[in-house]
Curated annotation (Swiss-Prot):
One of its GO terms (cellular component) is side of membrane. Heme binds at D42. This is GPI-anchored hemophore ARB_01017. GO terms for molecular function: metal ion binding.
Amino acid sequence: MKLSVVALAALVSVAAAQGVSELPKCAQDCASKGFPSSCGADVKCVCTSNSFLDAITCCVATTCTAEEQKKTIQFAKGICGGVGVNVPDSAVCPTGGSSSSGSASSTPTSSGGSSSETGSVTGTAITGTNSPTPTSRRPSGSSTAHSSGSGSPATSTGAPTQTGNAAASVNANGGLLAAIAALVIAVA
C-alpha cells in the first residue's frame, strides 16, 4: 500500500513538471479509455501494456490533429522516458493483421552455390536476413587413354549465417500514450 502511494506521488510530480495543460483534450479523452487496472500506479507497467497501447495510440492517431499528436508524443516521452521506456516519434494505428514480403534466390555454380533470403514484417517492427552460403567441391581428377585416374569424393561444407535486426520495442507504439493514461487516472 505504501509503495502505491509513493508511486502515485512520483507520477503526480512528473505530470506536474510536464504540465497537464500541454496535453491536448483529444489525448485526454483517449487516455481515459481502457486503462489497464492491473498496473495500478506503476508507470512502467502502463507504458508497456500492449493492448492498452494499441488502443490509445490508435485513438490518438485517428482523433487528434497532427499538431495534437506531436504534443501528445512529447508529453508521453517525458513520462515514459522517466522509467526507461522509449516512445516513438509518431502515433500509428495498428492494423488487424500483418503483412510480409520476402525473396529467395539460388545461383549454383561449378564451384559451389549460394542462396539468400530476405524478408520483413510490418506492424511489429521486426526485420531480418538469412544468408546461408554453402560451398561444395565436385570430384576432380584426370584420366588417360589407359583408363587410369584419380579422384576425390564430393564434400560439402558450409556455415549458414544469420543476421537480423529486431527493434527492441515493446510494440509499434512503444508506450506512446500510456503515460497520459497514468496521469489521467492519477489526477482523477
